[in-house]
Amino acid sequence: MSDGSVEPVKADDAVVDSSKRTHEEMSAENTEPVSEQAHGTGSENGDGENSLENSLEKDNAEKDNAESEKGSPSVTETAADDDSSKTDGNGEENQDAEGLAEDYDEEDFDEDEDDEDEEPAAKRRQQERNRFLDIEAEVSEDEEDEEDEEDSELVREGFITHGEDEDDEEGVAGNRRGDRLHRQLDQDLNKSSEEDAQRLAKELRERYGRSSSKQYRAAAQDGYVPQRFLLPSVDTATIWGVRCRPGKEKELVRKLLKKKFNLDRAMGKRKLKILSIFQRDNYTGRIYIEAPKQSVIEKFCNGVPDIYISQKLLIPVQELPLLLKPSKSDDVALEEGSYVRVKRGIYKGDLAMVDQISENNLEVMLKIVPRLDYGKFDEIDPVTQQRKSRRPTFAHRPAPQLFNPTMALRLDQANLYKRDDRHFTYKNEDYIDGYLYKSFRIQHVETKNIQPTVEELARFGSKEGAVDLTAISQSIKKAQAAKVSFQPGDRVEILNGEQRGSRGIVAKSTTTIATVNLPEFPLKPLEFPVSALRKIFEPGDHVMVINGEHQGDAGLVLTIKQGQVTFMSNQTREEVTITANNLSKSIDSTPTSSEYSLHDIVELSAKNVACIIQAGHDIFKVIDETGKVSTITKGSILSKINTSRSRLTTVDSSGNEIKIGDSIVEKIGARREGQVLYIQSQQIFVVSKKIVENAGVFVVNPVNVEAIASKDNMLNNKLDLSKMNPDIISKMGPPKSSMPSAAPVRTGREVALGKTVRVRSAGYKGQLGIVKDVNGDKATVELHSKNKHITIDKRKLTYYNREGGEGITYDELVNRRGRLPQARMGPSYVSAPRHMASGASGVVADNNGALAGGMTPGWGAFDGGKTPAVNSHGAGTSGATSAWGGASTWGGQGAGGSSTWGGQGGATSTWGGQGATSTWGGASAWGNKSSWGGASTWAASGEANGGVSTWGGGDRSTYGGASTWGNNATGGTSTWGGNNQEQNNGGNRSAWKDQGNKSNYGGGSSWGNQ
């Protein structure tokens, strides 16, 4: 056995430890010696002798068969192998150890499997080895079970073949055939692996190659993308939907993309892990960011305005294809001249026309009808006197009107700059031909579903009004012709098909199909297209227009001819012909076109009114106060005037009062008769049933008409004949009535216009202003303090003279025919004295002539403001006719002759002296050198009549102080006209005492204290 004749151990034998080999040697001692000898003899003959090998193999085979028939375990072969492994040298002992490990494992595995037939371990070991796998590893006891499972797996996969399936007689030939099969299997595996690699490369090239990219781009342009490109997996980066402000999506995507580029440039090789940023037009208020982690998105979006980072949503994987699926955009391509609407600002919702588009398609220049107030509502700072412009808001925005350079020049010249006759710059905005040209961002403009109205289209016409509203109305009518609707119960006629000419009743209807019950087919209703039906009406039916220019109009059907229905309009009283399908039956006979109807008085501006002579849905024909007939839109009407509550009146050529509802007749011309509809300034609107033109409405000046019947008498079916005879009116006195007097009536021009007024109602109470306009009972007042216009009831104002004076009410102003009280030039303290007696017994009588002016001078009286005379009972009536500067005497006959106050300058006449040189207005002037109560004597020195008495005893008394008239030794009683010192004498009691306390200029003045 030492000659190396032992069969070499296969490469797949495992190496076992010494403990297992010792156990194997113990098992080998129990084997039969015959087997060991036979095996050892075969080993000594050498491997080179084929005959010996064949004989040994045959002997072994016979022994194995004999042992298998007896049922004894085959352990002799194992013992022989153990002996041979011990005698081997040069590393053969390790190979035998590996064989023992393999035998141990197999035996241990076989002991567990009792159902399997036991075979010689050496032969089974040789046949179950894989010659093409080099499996050599050191294993431990813990990995024995895993090796057993791997071996069984190799057996199942065909890498190890069982010897029991082959004929045992083949021997080495069977092993060679097995080697050939294994080599062929390896070749097949190599070939299949190469084919798999080529096939995989082809698939990758088709999927990610350049040709596939071209196909993908072509498919994307066609709107179709294969589904395999849209299927993500859980390994792909997550996409988060982040909430943002609606309308800011595209702007935020550009902003975030720019931020990413800046961060990548600053960080160098460390790129930010943001893979993509996008938004979808179908999902407003969200942007989508693709990133591997949520924290990356939070840090990336931190500090960016208009992003609500706390409100983010993870998009599920199954919804990603729908999110990334391309859809056809519904955006309208903007072109010059197309109509759009503004989304924000004071022009929100206004129609605009595209004038220019920027090169980057991000901004657009629009042509808009401006909304300006020209600084009417600006406030002025009371300290700096600077104008504070108020920015108009959407709630208080002005009406759309073309730019008026005259108004801007008059009200806000500082902000106006003229470039040429057509181009102006006002508040840094350009106005050309009256239109505003302003740039807007594309996201602030609405481009879809723009349906301009007739009113809006009319504003974009030329300044001369070249827009043909009739043509626009006809185009709208044609567009609405397709909007035909049928209601259940409508009687219709079939126009096309086999049932042409049949008539039936609509059972139900949709936008395109109508179900009709025909008498010829009572069992089953038939369906017809809407275009094949026509409505049926009869004369006398009351119909209403549901589509077209006359939408909302109603009336009675007169005739029907070839599908055209003619009816009498309830609004215009004219015949209207319209297609039958644009009508529907109506039980309401009142016109319902809009809030305006025939003969309504409407306000077009602050000073212009008109009467509607033809009413439509959006277009009206009116006649203004000048008699001009024009066509306007509904938006041009500011408001409707309620004539039933109007108190406006005027007078005819005879001075008779005319009010709304009265009947008048023209004095000259066609002598047209009619009823007054409205009174405006110097014109009146009259409607006549005898005139067909302009719906019977005409405008006439009240000077050219006569009133023939008042409204009140018309209600009582009586004519007011008294107003037709001026002689009777002149003989008739003023009407007597116990009732309170009626409110004053207006005559001629409005008396309140241009008057200075003070507000008496709350809100602006006490503020001064000027009446700029009057419309009915309302007056437009321009306040002085705020440069602001307000509208207020004209009877809640107090009217003043421009120079001051007392205020009066509106009714007093009307009674005075617009004349205001004269303004005071200054305060007056003159009180006319009573007539004084000439003797000691003369008593200054009390004044009972209060109506004549008595004590207080009559400021602003109707007689020109003259000082009234003093009416005395005790001294005659010599002072009754005295005037302020006239020739009447001051004191009559007994007080000093015929001295005048200022008639002859006071040169020669004295107050009470006898030739004295001190006159009232002579050398000693009233206010020249002498003071008011100073050393100036009342008369010449030495006279008894108050010779030494001064006004204030030398003191400068005030107007209402406690100064006495004189300061004599008798107790202070002034002796104006007598020598008696008694207080009870008639001349001693001063008449100033009784009435002096009532003076308006000094309060409790004691001019005449006893």
UniProtKB/Swiss-Prot annotation:
Compositional bias segments (type: Acidic residues): 90-119, 135-152
Spell out the InterPro entries in the cross-references: KOW, KOW_Spt5_1, KOW_Spt5_2, KOW_Spt5_3, KOW_Spt5_4, KOW_Spt5_5, NGN-domain, NGN-like_dom
Q: What are the UniProt keywords, alphabetically? A: mRNA processing, Nucleus, Repeat, Transcription
Instruction: Report the residue ranges that make up the KOW domain in this protein.
Output: 333-360, 536-563, 750-777
Which biological process annotations from GO are given for this protein?
Answer: intracellular mRNA localization; negative regulation of transcription elongation by RNA polymerase I; positive regulation of autophagy; positive regulation of transcription elongation by RNA polymerase I; positive regulation of transcription elongation by RNA polymerase II; regulation of rRNA processing; regulation of transcription-coupled nucleotide-excision repair; spliceosomal complex assembly
Q: Where in the cell is it found?
A: Nucleus
Major location category of this protein: nucleus
Region Disordered, annotated ranges: 1-155, 160-179, 895-1010
Q: Name one GO molecular function term.
A: transcription elongation factor activity
In what ranges is there compositional bias, type Polar residues? 28-44, 960-973
Q: Where is the composition biased (Gly residues)?
A: 895-906, 1001-1010
Pfam families, sorted: KOW1_SPT5, KOW4_SPT5, KOW5_SPT5, KOWx_SPT5, Spt5-NGN, Spt5_N
Identify the GO cellular component terms for this protein. Answer: DSIF complex; rDNA heterochromatin
Renumbered to this chain, the Low complexity biased-composition regions fall at: 907-943, 977-988
Instruction: State where composition is biased (Basic and acidic residues).
Output: 9-26, 55-70, 120-134
Q: What family does the database annotate?
A: Belongs to the SPT5 family.
Complex formation: Component of the SPT4-SPT5 complex. Interacts with RNA polymerase II.
The task this protein performs is described as:
The SPT4-SPT5 complex mediates both activation and inhibition of transcription elongation, and plays a role in pre-mRNA processing. This complex seems to be important for the stability of the RNA polymerase II elongation machinery on the chromatin template but not for the inherent ability of this machinery to translocate down the gene.
The name of this protein is: Transcription elongation factor SPT5
User: Which species is this UniProt entry from?
Assistant: Candida glabrata (strain ATCC 2001 / BCRC 20586 / JCM 3761 / NBRC 0622 / NRRL Y-65 / CBS 138)
- Taxonomically, what lineage is the organism? Eukaryota, Fungi, Dikarya, Ascomycota, Saccharomycotina
